[in-house]
Amino acid sequence: MKQIIRLITTLLLLSLIGITCAAVAKLHETDKKFKGVELPEKFLDDFNLEVGKLQYANLFRSKKDDITHSAGEIRIDQQGSFSRGEKKKKFKVYNLQAQTNGKSSKTVAHVEVFDTIDAKTKAEQNEVLALAKEAFTKSKDSGKLYQVIPN
């Protein structure tokens, strides 16, 4: 419950910040559906807890890893990164997925974060983090890939 309150508080604060300064990033809903599973109601608290544990620096790690060090039924994995763009304008995209734990893990949310987001200040980094958290929730609800892209 504390994690949910913290997430809501963060989103509210960032919406206020967005009023006073230009946003460095935005959400993009793609048409791409991922082959995942609908999150069972009993796992919803674990999902919210894991999303709440996300940190800005972990969004941009290349190492494939459980970036939230989950103990519950859901984990958030860094699935690696890949390049996009043309030769002179290549950039990295970081592939993050919320998955069920266990032998036959299934994706329940899929988010990509572009490394071309220019978040220099703590406020801008908090904005990007809040967008990533929102992207996980929207992806879980829609079954679609969400991207956090430069504004």
From Swiss-Prot:
From what superkingdom does this record's organism come?
A: Eukaryota
Signal peptide, first to last residue: 1-22
Report the PANTHER family cross-referenced here. APC REGULATOR OF WNT-SIGNALING PATHWAY-RELATED, TUBULIN POLYMERIZATION-PROMOTING PROTEIN
A single GO cellular-component term on record: vacuole
The job of this chain, per UniProt, is described as: Has an essential role in the initiation of differentiation. Also required for cAMP signaling.
Q: Which UniProt keywords apply?
A: Differentiation, Endoplasmic reticulum, Signal, Vacuole
| Coarse class of the protein's main subcellular location | endoplasmic reticulum
Q: Which GO terms describe its biological process?
A: adenylate cyclase-activating G protein-coupled cAMP receptor signaling pathway; aggregation involved in sorocarp development; cell differentiation; culmination involved in sorocarp development
Q: What is the lineage of its organism?
A: Eukaryota, Amoebozoa, Evosea, Eumycetozoa, Dictyostelia
Compartments where found: Endoplasmic reticulum; Vacuole
The record ties this protein, via InterPro entries, to:
Diff-assoc_signaling (IPR053358)
Name of the protein in its database record: Differentiation-associated protein 2
User: What is the protein's species of origin?
Assistant: Dictyostelium discoideum (Social amoeba)
